[in-house]
Amino acid sequence: LFASYLSEHPIDVLKIVPSHFKALVATADGQALWPRKFLLFGGEALSWDLVEQVRRQAACIVINHYGPTETTVGALTTVVGDNEDVRLARTVPIGRPIDNLEAYILDERQEPVPVGAAGELYLGGAGVARGYWEQPDRTAERFLPNPHASQPGARLYRTGDLARRLPDGSIEFLGRV
């Protein structure tokens, strides 16, 4: 149904979860699904195989996007390119923080880990929520003071995601902690 709609109404931008997009491509006339300008993936790890499939069949720009609800959904993003350092990642990197957000890869003591080392992904900045509605214990567990910020009262959101910073500064999602 969606694919038939797209064949009659071409679109410029599509934002979708990779597994959903794969299922659509497998069951539909492929050309109808391709947006004319941008294809944004988010919600789960994006494989290089899917990126290559898109590049073979479409001329649109591929963007990978990461962001939990606790950071107003959008937090990190990248235009998927062929940077040699990035291609060393197992999955397509989730990118760099958008304006007014910071991303930290920290160890169990909340200290930064070296480039390439795995650690937990923490997000800070203007997009971080205040906490969970009427759940003070859960809020205290996930929303922490930011020891790396220059402004007093800054907080971090502990995502529970395992990640590493690549040599080019982008971040690769590795799974859940």
Language model features: what each stretch is:
Residues 1-93, 100-112:
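Adenylate-forming
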Residues 61-64, 79-177:
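AMP-dependent adenylate-forming
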